[in-house]
Amino acid sequence: MAFPTAEEITQRVQQIVGPRGLDVEKVDIKKAGAKSAVIIRIDGDQRPDLDVIEELSDEISRNFDAAESDGELNFGAGYRLEVSTPGFDEPLLAARHFRRQRGHIATFVLNQADDEHATANAANARFVARVGALNADETELAVVLPGKKEPSVKTYPLDQIREAKLEVEFSTPPEAEMSLVNTPFDQLG
């Protein structure tokens, strides 16, 4: 039996974290003999704290050990298990990612150039905005664009957003922007 795939690990781990309202965001496998690593990123609408991560890591480890003893999995000569939340540099790709990062600043890359808010270059249309509300069926996202006098809101279908990455923000967000961020999607003008 070969080293388990990322898909096999994702399915197994989702059964453990799902009942806690968490999702498996990413599984990376680095094969290197006895120094192999299985890196699992989990997250939820309520971000798991370190105690929850530790409990889940122990539970996942026990599950993998039992599955290996039963011949269901084979990690070979050994492996290191890492369980954590996604890093700051992970792209926002799904509705749940935007929902969890509401209020944060991100650089957005669109599938095609937009109006004055995006600077089109050879392949990308990019702009910086604050993540706002999603519509009820989570297919459209409102973003809050900083303005010279007042911020404005623009909405995009999620399938028009190729990628969004969070930006580090050291200052307190402007009140006018946060007011728009906290406005429900259906109440935005």
From Swiss-Prot:
InterPro entries: Ribosome_maturation_RimP, RimP_N, RimP_N_sf. Keywords: Cytoplasm, Ribosome biogenesis. One of its GO terms (cellular component) is cytosol. It is found in: Cytoplasm. The keyword tRNA-binding does not apply. SUPFAM superfamilies: YhbC-like, N-terminal domain. Its main location: cytoplasm. Pfam families: RimP_N. It comes from the Bacteria. One of its GO terms (biological process) is translation. NCBIfam families: PRK00092.2-2. HAMAP family: RimP (MF_01077). Required for maturation of 30S ribosomal subunits. Belongs to the RimP family. This is Ribosome maturation factor RimP.
